[in-house]
Amino acid sequence: MSSSVGATLEAIKYTRGSLEILDQLLIPKSFIYEVVDTTEKAFHAIRDMKVRGAPAIAIVAVLTLAVEANQLLQSNDALLADASAIAKLFNEKLDRLAESRPTAVNLFQAVGDFKNKIAQSLETNKTGTEIVQLIIDEAEALMNRDIEENAKISECGSDHIISTNPSSTTLKVLTHCNTGALATMKYGTALGVIRFLQKKNVLEHAFCTETRPYNQGARLTAFELVYEKIPSTLICDSAVSYLFKTKKIDAIIVGADRVCNNGDTANKIGTYHIAVSAKHHGIPFYVAAPFTSIDLTLASGDLITIEERSEKEITHYRNNDERAVVENIGVWNPGFDVTTADLISGFFTDIGVFTPLTCATTGKKYYDLKTQQAEKLKQQ
């Protein structure tokens, strides 16, 4: 383990054969990088939320496979001679990793993609060594794509907000949970947009919610904002509506763990009520996410599986495990909620901005992201 944080904030440190993650449960009190070199370590790091954020979860999962694949190559393990055995081994590892967090679509897409590539390798008579090398190469490619995607999201999102506020150089924005460099390889999604607004000298202030019960906003986003010297204020989750009423907020930007074809969006618990209040107060509400977070196979948010987390996250103090509430009270602790598409002003993605379509007959606003994606790609 190491405890140094460099000039550039990194949640994930990777070189071929080596993977370390910043234990986000300890921030801001401590900065400890933990070695992750087995599937089981990755499973527990993801499940226990030492690493979190949909893109980062997928990246840590596949980079762990890359580390294990590199170990096989370096040891010249006899297993490399058996392509079927190699495929079986890594498919089992992928299945295990998929069990860690049920809501983040990026992880399931990565697992599916890697399984397909392994199957194709067997069909084309690749050797065990070639399959192992493929796993390393594909994992590193996913890591590099995430960096590129975040930069594109941040650029197009900040440009869109500026274009819809053309006379303002004093923008005030709100974000929820943590969607920055700690949730990705670099920049972040929603927090990346805020970073780019600051870089373009149009941001006056960023507000972040504490994000109960795990306090990702208070522990992580507040830390990132201060680290980047962005003017910022932390508020209680329950203060959001009063903030909207008393301060001039120009935009809300959140991330996403899963987006449906119709635009319904699963994100950290508390997102939905922020969107409802934003609609009431006439403030645009944006979702920033890589297009890989959009599950075009899901018609609506009713089909999203919502992770329910331990009641201890609410009933006990995290630092000393002491009970904070009366015994025998019922507890409901969903980790996510679903914001309906009618509350969302637009999606900032790595392939551009998606705003609602208008039905020609009814005038009703709606999203059809599969169709909109196809149209967007035609234009590029």
Swiss-Prot record:
Coiled coil start-end: none
What catalytic activity does the UniProt entry give for this protein?
5-(methylsulfanyl)-alpha-D-ribose 1-phosphate = 5-(methylsulfanyl)-D-ribulose 1-phosphate
The transmembrane segments are none
Q: Which UniProt keywords apply?
A: Amino-acid biosynthesis, Cytoplasm, Isomerase, Methionine biosynthesis, Nucleus
Segment forming the signal sequence: none
**Enzyme Commission no:** 5.3.1.23
| SUPFAM superfamilies given in the database record | NagB/RpiA/CoA transferase-like
**Pathway recorded for this protein:** Amino-acid biosynthesis; L-methionine biosynthesis via salvage pathway; L-methionine from S-methyl-5-thio-alpha-D-ribose 1-phosphate: step 1/6
List GO molecular-function terms, semicolon-separated: S-methyl-5-thioribose-1-phosphate isomerase activity
Can you tell me which residues form the catalytic site? 257 (proton donor)
Location of site Transition state stabilizer? 177
Note one Pfam family from the annotation. IF-2B
Q: Name one GO cellular component term.
A: nucleus
GO BP annotations listed: L-methionine salvage from methylthioadenosine
EC class: isomerase
Tell me where in or outside the cell this protein is found: Cytoplasm; Nucleus
Biological role: Catalyzes the interconversion of methylthioribose-1-phosphate (MTR-1-P) into methylthioribulose-1-phosphate (MTRu-1-P).
NCBIfam families the record matches: eIF-2B_rel (TIGR00524), PRK05720.1 (NF004326), salvage_mtnA (TIGR00512)
Belongs to which family? Belongs to the eIF-2B alpha/beta/delta subunits family. MtnA subfamily.
Which protein, by its recorded name, is this? Methylthioribose-1-phosphate isomerase
This protein's species is Naegleria gruberi
